[in-house]
Amino acid sequence: MVLDSGLAVGTRPTVDAPPELAGWAGAASAVHACQQMAFPMTLRLHVAAHDVIAIDFASNAFEWSVSLDDFPQAPETVLVETRPGSLDAPAIELPGRSLDPLLWSIGLHAFGDEPAPWLVPGHRYRLRRWPSLSEVPVNLDQVRMIAMLGNAFATADELAAAAQTPPLDARRLVNALAVMGILRRSAGAPAFEAAGPHRRPTASGTTGLFNRLRERWGR
């Protein structure tokens, strides 16, 4: 059975996150909640010493005075403010900046070596669409793992084993894609199998997928 994970919660004003959801963890959880709403939502993230991020989910865009090249990996605080949005009155000046690179950056740094709290243990995940990551650096291991998730369901540990990369890196990547809201999950998909034992995927062996991804990212 294939599902899109979902959790609907109400809106809330600017608040301090509980300790377990401090920093980007609280922001990532708020992003996920907004993505599950049946009506448009906007989100404002007050990042300590780094101004305010304004996100309009209906427009799939955000505003922020900070370049993603200077993304703060561990800000002292991130205060969260959610508000109802409107399709007729965007909360930011459009076209804004593409949302995928921001959510990718938040997801990579939100939960450390733990999975995002809405990911279900034992379930496998696969891409619903390719990410759009033209504003952020993506290394070859990440490209490999994204390509794998574009073609099969896998857990983070299975992904790490197949890509021969540290499990922490695979968990962070799955978290980033989960915060972007582009994963679907399956309780019954078969275990992911690598192309061969003890073989690290090579660029030449996955050229088609890499080219498609890099073309999608504008690289």
Label every PLM stretch briefly:
Residues 1-219:
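Acidic, Ser/Thr/Pro-enriched low-complexity segments and adjacent helix/loop capping patches
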